[in-house]
Amino acid sequence: MVLIRVLANLLILQLSYAQKSSELVVGGDECNINEHRFLVLVYTDGIQCGGTLINKEWMLTAAHCDGKKMKLQFGLHSKNVPNKDKQTRVPKKKYFFPCSKNFTKWDKDIMLIRLNHPVNNSTHIAPLSLPSKPPSQDTVCNIMGWGTISPTKEIYPDVPHCANINIVDHAVCRAFYPGLLEKSKTLCAGILEGGKDTCQGVSGGPLICNGQIQGIVSVGGDPCAEPRVPALYTKVFDHLDWIKSIIAGNTAATCPL
Protein backbone atom coordinates (compact mmCIF):
# COMPACT_ATOMS: atom_id res chain seq x y z
CA MET A 1 0.00 0.00 0.00
CA VAL A 2 1.35 3.42 -0.95
CA LEU A 3 1.39 6.05 1.81
CA ILE A 4 2.96 9.53 1.85
CA ARG A 5 5.53 9.43 4.60
CA VAL A 6 3.98 11.27 7.49
CA LEU A 7 3.62 10.24 11.11
CA ALA A 8 -0.10 10.78 11.74
CA ASN A 9 -3.34 9.33 10.44
CA LEU A 10 -4.87 12.75 11.06
CA LEU A 11 -2.86 14.25 8.23
CA ILE A 12 -3.72 11.32 5.99
CA LEU A 13 -7.41 12.03 6.54
CA GLN A 14 -6.81 15.73 6.02
CA LEU A 15 -5.23 15.17 2.62
CA SER A 16 -7.92 12.61 1.72
CA TYR A 17 -5.72 10.10 -0.02
CA ALA A 18 -3.49 7.25 1.12
CA GLN A 19 -0.07 8.49 2.13
CA LYS A 20 2.96 7.15 3.82
CA SER A 21 4.20 8.38 7.18
CA SER A 22 7.02 10.94 7.14
CA GLU A 23 10.16 9.19 6.07
CA LEU A 24 13.22 8.10 7.91
CA VAL A 25 16.58 7.14 6.51
CA VAL A 26 16.92 3.35 6.52
CA GLY A 27 20.32 1.81 5.81
CA GLY A 28 22.26 5.00 6.47
CA ASP A 29 24.79 6.27 8.99
CA GLU A 30 25.01 9.35 11.18
CA CYS A 31 25.58 12.42 9.02
CA ASN A 32 28.75 14.42 9.54
CA ILE A 33 27.82 17.43 11.66
CA ASN A 34 29.07 19.79 8.93
CA GLU A 35 27.39 18.19 5.89
CA HIS A 36 23.78 19.26 6.52
CA ARG A 37 23.93 22.99 7.27
CA PHE A 38 20.80 23.51 5.10
CA LEU A 39 18.74 20.77 6.75
CA VAL A 40 15.63 21.88 8.65
CA LEU A 41 13.77 19.91 11.30
CA VAL A 42 10.05 20.65 10.97
CA TYR A 43 7.47 20.04 13.69
CA THR A 44 3.88 20.57 12.63
CA ASP A 45 0.81 19.60 14.67
CA GLY A 46 2.70 16.73 16.33
CA ILE A 47 4.21 15.49 13.06
CA GLN A 48 7.94 15.46 12.25
CA CYS A 49 9.13 16.39 8.77
CA GLY A 50 12.26 17.71 7.12
CA GLY A 51 12.97 20.75 4.99
CA THR A 52 15.70 22.61 3.13
CA LEU A 53 16.95 26.17 3.54
CA ILE A 54 17.43 27.73 0.07
CA ASN A 55 18.28 31.26 1.19
CA LYS A 56 18.28 33.15 4.48
CA GLU A 57 14.54 33.84 4.30
CA TRP A 58 13.07 30.89 2.36
CA MET A 59 12.87 27.11 2.66
CA LEU A 60 11.28 24.16 0.85
CA THR A 61 9.37 21.20 2.25
CA ALA A 62 6.51 18.91 1.18
CA ALA A 63 2.95 20.26 0.93
CA HIS A 64 1.66 17.33 2.97
CA CYS A 65 3.78 18.53 5.91
CA ASP A 66 1.58 21.61 6.26
CA GLY A 67 -0.14 22.27 9.56
CA LYS A 68 -1.58 25.03 11.72
CA LYS A 69 1.37 25.12 14.12
CA MET A 70 4.76 24.78 12.46
CA LYS A 71 8.11 25.10 14.23
CA LEU A 72 11.22 25.22 12.04
CA GLN A 73 14.62 24.41 13.54
CA PHE A 74 17.88 25.33 11.80
CA GLY A 75 21.47 24.40 12.68
CA LEU A 76 20.42 21.26 14.54
CA HIS A 77 22.39 18.01 14.77
CA SER A 78 21.67 16.35 18.11
CA LYS A 79 18.10 16.97 19.21
CA ASN A 80 19.06 16.35 22.83
CA VAL A 81 22.21 18.51 22.82
CA PRO A 82 21.49 21.38 20.37
CA ASN A 83 24.29 23.35 18.73
CA LYS A 84 24.84 26.81 20.20
CA ASP A 85 23.97 28.40 16.84
CA LYS A 86 20.61 26.63 16.51
CA GLN A 87 17.86 29.00 15.37
CA THR A 88 14.08 28.54 15.49
CA ARG A 89 11.58 30.19 13.17
CA VAL A 90 7.92 29.93 12.19
CA PRO A 91 6.36 30.54 8.77
CA LYS A 92 5.53 34.10 7.83
CA LYS A 93 3.81 32.88 4.67
CA LYS A 94 3.31 29.50 2.99
CA TYR A 95 2.95 29.00 -0.76
CA PHE A 96 1.64 25.95 -2.61
CA PHE A 97 2.02 24.93 -6.23
CA PRO A 98 -0.88 26.36 -8.30
CA CYS A 99 -3.97 24.19 -8.52
CA SER A 100 -4.25 22.42 -11.86
CA LYS A 101 -6.23 19.44 -13.05
CA ASN A 102 -3.31 18.61 -15.33
CA PHE A 103 -1.13 17.55 -12.39
CA THR A 104 -1.42 14.59 -10.04
CA LYS A 105 -1.30 14.82 -6.23
CA TRP A 106 2.40 13.90 -6.43
CA ASP A 107 3.26 16.76 -8.79
CA LYS A 108 1.96 19.27 -6.26
CA ASP A 109 3.67 17.96 -3.11
CA ILE A 110 5.81 21.06 -2.60
CA MET A 111 5.56 23.98 -0.19
CA LEU A 112 7.65 27.15 -0.24
CA ILE A 113 7.89 28.88 3.14
CA ARG A 114 8.92 32.44 3.87
CA LEU A 115 10.35 32.65 7.38
CA ASN A 116 9.10 35.14 9.95
CA HIS A 117 12.71 36.36 10.30
CA PRO A 118 15.78 35.60 8.16
CA VAL A 119 18.25 33.10 9.61
CA ASN A 120 21.90 34.00 10.02
CA ASN A 121 24.55 31.90 8.32
CA SER A 122 26.76 30.24 10.91
CA THR A 123 28.96 27.22 11.54
CA HIS A 124 25.96 24.90 11.20
CA ILE A 125 23.57 26.96 9.03
CA ALA A 126 23.87 27.75 5.31
CA PRO A 127 21.49 27.43 2.32
CA LEU A 128 21.59 24.71 -0.34
CA SER A 129 21.69 25.64 -4.03
CA LEU A 130 18.68 25.22 -6.28
CA PRO A 131 19.26 22.91 -9.28
CA SER A 132 20.95 24.20 -12.43
CA LYS A 133 19.79 21.15 -14.41
CA PRO A 134 17.86 17.95 -13.61
CA PRO A 135 19.75 14.82 -12.56
CA SER A 136 20.23 12.00 -15.05
CA GLN A 137 19.40 8.35 -14.49
CA ASP A 138 21.87 6.50 -12.21
CA THR A 139 23.10 9.74 -10.61
CA VAL A 140 24.16 9.05 -7.03
CA CYS A 141 22.25 11.29 -4.63
CA ASN A 142 22.08 11.77 -0.87
CA ILE A 143 19.11 11.51 1.50
CA MET A 144 19.16 12.63 5.13
CA GLY A 145 17.04 13.33 8.16
CA TRP A 146 15.98 12.42 11.69
CA GLY A 147 13.45 9.83 10.55
CA THR A 148 13.13 6.30 11.82
CA ILE A 149 16.09 4.06 11.05
CA SER A 150 14.05 0.84 10.92
CA PRO A 151 11.73 -0.13 8.04
CA THR A 152 9.27 -1.83 10.40
CA LYS A 153 9.63 -0.02 13.77
CA GLU A 154 9.50 3.65 14.71
CA ILE A 155 13.06 4.06 16.03
CA TYR A 156 13.95 7.75 15.82
CA PRO A 157 17.60 8.74 16.21
CA ASP A 158 18.89 11.74 18.14
CA VAL A 159 21.02 12.78 15.14
CA PRO A 160 20.29 12.85 11.39
CA HIS A 161 21.25 9.86 9.28
CA CYS A 162 22.51 10.01 5.69
CA ALA A 163 22.52 7.47 2.85
CA ASN A 164 23.31 7.39 -0.86
CA ILE A 165 20.71 6.24 -3.37
CA ASN A 166 20.39 6.41 -7.17
CA ILE A 167 18.09 8.15 -9.64
CA VAL A 168 16.04 5.30 -11.13
CA ASP A 169 14.25 4.96 -14.47
CA HIS A 170 10.84 6.59 -14.01
CA ALA A 171 9.16 3.54 -15.55
CA VAL A 172 10.02 1.58 -12.40
CA CYS A 173 8.00 4.02 -10.28
CA ARG A 174 5.13 4.12 -12.77
CA ALA A 175 4.84 0.35 -12.41
CA PHE A 176 4.40 0.69 -8.65
CA TYR A 177 2.42 3.94 -8.31
CA PRO A 178 -0.85 3.73 -10.31
CA GLY A 179 -1.76 7.01 -11.99
CA LEU A 180 1.77 8.37 -12.12
CA LEU A 181 2.17 10.19 -15.43
CA GLU A 182 5.08 9.60 -17.80
CA LYS A 183 5.89 13.32 -17.69
CA SER A 184 5.29 13.65 -13.97
CA LYS A 185 7.01 16.43 -12.03
CA THR A 186 8.64 13.81 -9.81
CA LEU A 187 11.92 11.93 -9.51
CA CYS A 188 12.14 8.20 -8.92
CA ALA A 189 15.05 7.29 -6.64
CA GLY A 190 16.23 4.44 -4.46
CA ILE A 191 18.23 1.22 -4.39
CA LEU A 192 16.56 -1.50 -6.48
CA GLU A 193 18.12 -4.20 -4.30
CA GLY A 194 16.47 -2.58 -1.28
CA GLY A 195 18.02 -1.76 2.07
CA LYS A 196 18.32 2.04 1.79
CA ASP A 197 15.38 4.41 1.73
CA THR A 198 13.62 7.35 3.31
CA CYS A 199 10.87 6.48 5.79
CA GLN A 200 8.79 7.83 8.71
CA GLY A 201 9.92 11.27 9.88
CA VAL A 202 11.75 12.61 6.80
CA SER A 203 8.95 13.81 4.51
CA GLY A 204 9.79 17.19 3.01
CA GLY A 205 13.52 16.64 3.37
CA PRO A 206 15.99 16.97 0.49
CA LEU A 207 17.23 14.65 -2.23
CA ILE A 208 20.68 16.11 -2.93
CA CYS A 209 22.51 15.43 -6.18
CA ASN A 210 25.82 17.08 -7.05
CA GLY A 211 25.48 19.58 -4.23
CA GLN A 212 22.02 20.83 -5.24
CA ILE A 213 18.50 20.13 -4.01
CA GLN A 214 16.91 18.04 -6.76
CA GLY A 215 14.02 16.43 -4.92
CA ILE A 216 11.71 16.70 -1.92
CA VAL A 217 10.80 13.51 -0.04
CA SER A 218 7.19 12.72 -0.93
CA VAL A 219 5.96 9.13 -1.33
CA GLY A 220 7.34 5.66 -0.74
CA GLY A 221 6.53 2.01 -0.22
CA ASP A 222 5.32 0.52 3.05
CA PRO A 223 7.40 -0.97 4.56
CA CYS A 224 10.35 1.18 3.54
CA ALA A 225 13.48 -0.03 1.75
CA GLU A 226 11.83 -2.96 -0.04
CA PRO A 227 13.50 -4.30 -3.22
CA ARG A 228 12.29 -2.75 -6.48
CA VAL A 229 10.14 -0.17 -4.67
CA PRO A 230 11.90 3.19 -5.10
CA ALA A 231 10.43 6.35 -3.62
CA LEU A 232 8.96 9.40 -5.31
CA TYR A 233 10.49 12.85 -4.81
CA THR A 234 8.95 16.11 -5.96
CA LYS A 235 11.19 17.32 -8.80
CA VAL A 236 12.49 20.74 -7.78
CA PHE A 237 13.87 21.60 -11.23
CA ASP A 238 10.38 21.43 -12.75
CA HIS A 239 9.16 23.95 -10.15
CA LEU A 240 12.07 26.39 -10.50
CA ASP A 241 10.19 29.12 -12.38
CA TRP A 242 7.41 29.05 -9.80
CA ILE A 243 9.86 29.15 -6.87
CA LYS A 244 11.83 32.05 -8.30
CA SER A 245 8.65 33.93 -9.18
CA ILE A 246 7.29 33.67 -5.63
CA ILE A 247 10.58 34.76 -4.08
CA ALA A 248 10.66 37.71 -6.49
CA GLY A 249 7.25 38.82 -5.21
CA ASN A 250 4.86 37.45 -7.84
CA THR A 251 2.31 35.61 -5.72
CA ALA A 252 -0.71 35.92 -8.02
CA ALA A 253 -0.54 32.40 -9.46
CA THR A 254 -0.84 30.39 -6.25
CA CYS A 255 -3.72 28.65 -4.51
CA PRO A 256 -3.97 26.34 -1.49
CA LEU A 257 -4.16 22.57 -1.95
UniProtKB/Swiss-Prot annotation:
One of its GO terms (cellular component) is secretory granule. One of its GO terms (biological process) is proteolysis. It is found in: Secreted. The active site is at H64, D109, S203. Coiled coil: none annotated. GO terms for molecular function: serine-type endopeptidase activity; toxin activity. Monomer. Belongs to the peptidase S1 family. Snake venom subfamily. Snake venom serine protease that may act in the hemostasis system of the prey. This is Snake venom serine protease KN10. It comes from Trimeresurus stejnegeri (Chinese green tree viper).
